[in-house]
Amino acid sequence: MIDLKFLRENPEVVKQNIRNKFQDQKLPLVDEVIELDAQRRTTQQQADDLKQKRNTISKQIGALMAQGKKEEAEEAKKEVAEFGDELAALDKKQAELEEEVKKRMMIIPNIIDPSVPIGKDDSENVEVQRFGEPKVPDFEIPYHTDIMEKLHGIDLDSARRVAGNGFYYLMGDIARLHSAVISYARDFMIDRGFTYCVPPFMIRSEVVTGVMSFAEMDAMMYKIEGEDLYLIGTSEHSMIGKFIDQMIPEAQLPQTLTSYSPCFRKEKGAHGIEERGVYRIHQFEKQEMIVICKPEDSMIWYDKLWKNTVDLFRSLDIPVRQLECCSGDLADLKVKSCDVEAWSPRQKKYFEVGSCSNLGDAQARRLRIRVAGENGKYFAHTLNNTVVAPPRMLIAFLENNLNADGSVNIPEVLRPYMGGKAKIEP
């Protein structure tokens, strides 16, 4: 949610930003907000003038009584009482106008960073850089679930009978590898100075609408029937929500957190759920990194978060690339974002395994996360980045470490989490 004062003073900037995101249907919202806000301010002024008049007359009542002018005092009391009804009507009107303004402001997209490439959708995202040397072995790499099944590590049929498509049972060394990757990622981030957290896996609707757009909410979130609770789609939701209505002393910034959680997603949209695979599913686990910082530091942290990703994948010897999200592919709250893509030797191309995002002060405005600084109070900036998100990470890991005989090599950094095991064998 952008600053209302900024929109009022820079309507054309906001409109051009909407055009850059190819959301022309939202252009009328800008003028609607300006008109509704003008009505709201007029109503506020009318209420303030009436309150001042009421206070003036109220002060006169005592003087009239002291002078023995009881009839005039009674008339003044009646006038003050009438002000009450009028003020109540004005307050109601103002509240209604504020709600209408808020509804529209929640839909208007955040102002993107000038460095973001202009494009309509993810087909126009721009490759920024690559790390690691992509390899294609001289043997055919099976589909990831075939690799897992040969290693007796996955049971999709049982999961389908129990819960439907989009779920899985991991077993044996594959389940252990899954936990090893999560544990290694956790310790990797702790070693970089991040505080480890395990957050609530459900959040209230106010937090949901504070951390994402309505479109994202509809496509992703599962609601608990009969409760004001939603299952989280990522631990970022809970971790940013942790600071709702908080005034953070500037000296306590930045807040650098790494959180683990299961994640639940409807995956309602163009891609949907895979019939037989673990790339796009309803339930998975993820290690996340979150930063709350001063506005002037957010782009610095954006680069730092991305470097953490590069260093982690390098330590696992998995080639990755950074793909800058174009304007049309950015979610409405994001200022700047890039996809983290890992190399797939089977497909001979990169595929998404995470994302790094700077949301500016959008989430902080919605959730009222402010900072008490030396020069006054201001809204914090929030950022997030995927550390690892198995099982997508497992797909990249298995393909890049597969041997011709179907065994999978375990990198040295993961062996302590695998009981010293150097290889998973059929």
Language-model-detected regions and their locations in the chain:
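TRNA-recognition modules of translation machinery and tRNA-sensing kinases, especially anticodon-binding
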Residues: 27, 130-426
